């Protein structure tokens, strides 16, 4: 609004009554490389305030007037498939067919764009959409943006081929990337994608998980004041750690050369190695728990390259430690809860669902005060009034836990938080959710954000929450808010729908035929059979496009009928189970075996 460009971190100078008159991005402490420093900026601003105070106050008034005027330029539109198709074309136009990703350097993973492409490809029978997502996922894994020694992805690549990253690792990136790789695995069955997801999750469990179950924000790029020092190696270091022959083989596998690929050192990568898929599917030797897809850890199963990774992992820890940002944020933790829950369901790994359950318990215990969400927790202190992203993402996380566990308490809590979100943040006149609550801190304007940038916007996530609650409960209260929200999003994305790819996921959910599957399960069913059936249904709920799954049993019948009134029409059988499937407006006769419906699902 002030300079025509943006960036991070944000620097704002304000009047004493909190009206901005100057903005910028990063300023070093002192001037360098021709760039003014913060000390010089503040000194100059103080001088201007003394001699030109009225001019600065007038400037602040003009900025305030402009910001307030933007609220009245909002327009609404009807959700339609034209925007969905346009978003695909926009992404296709800037797709890098050689290296994957979109546009030129720097390249960001933008996992929600990839999830959109996979969903679009499945619904529209457009294999080229899936191919774009797959190419990107493969090349990102092969590149240096993925940590081949310790797992996890860095924030972005400074080049076009994903080789040299900005080495900072963030929780939200890795959460969304797990979701993208799990989506790819569910769509294709290609084992590699499941392995990458597991390696990200093992990194998060090992490096970013608090002893009480919450997830930390991330790790810095620098160690000893040097960016990337922790992650790069010389050829001599590799040989010293692994021995001459093993070191030589490892260097050949992972592109470690004498001249290096980053300031004289080498970032391990598989960009020149055609055996990347086979290497990806091998288990690690980093003490990881491992999983069904990658067969457990190297402590129990061999794997020469990964034993070498274990030794290099320990070597670099001993060589230089990274600073860890150990704040625990509700919104970012919620994304990792979603990722863990989805991975657990699709990979058949209960340990990942357990990670999600523990993180939820942490939020419930430490980040709720007087019935409202806080923003962050650190060292025993919870602070900050929850914003839209906190309520929307946490509601979605609880709905994801319901989707994979079918525990009614998750659904109940999701609905309760979504009610607060709607009451405190929703603009009932024009649609859209404000960033700040109506009873929270009041700034000069109440803003709304819709652009799905590094993370999906709170407005896009809120739309998905409303949609899922509507599909599960059938409550028309959610429908009214959802309809207004989608009209608001449709207006906001006009002309640039590809910048709202997560919002488009909900739009597709609404515009394409939906599927509902109700399973009624007798109490006499064998316990192990019930467990396996629930796992199968959870997998379907995550992987099948447009499918909502509900399980009703004698144990949860009363609560289900209160939260989901239409389940009163689905009696629990005396023995076995019955499955009721509706596709669009067509409902089929109940069948006693899920296998009878698999093709339609």
Question: Where are each of the predicted segments found?
Answer:
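Extended, hydrophobic alpha-helical segments in both membrane/secreted and soluble proteins
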Residues: 153, 174-177, 181, 340, ...
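Long, polar/charge-rich, low-hydrophobicity segments
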Residues: 206-209, 368-392, 399-561
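Inter-helical turn/loop segments and adjacent helix faces that build the functional surface
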Residues: 120-124, 184-192, 343-350, 401-408, ...
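Conserved helix-loop functional segments at active or binding sites
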Residues: 314, 318, 342, 346, ...
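Replace the tail clause
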Residues: 1-339, 343-346, 486-601
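Glycine-rich, acidic and aromatic/proline-enriched surface loops and short helix-turn segments
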Residues: 139-146, 358-366
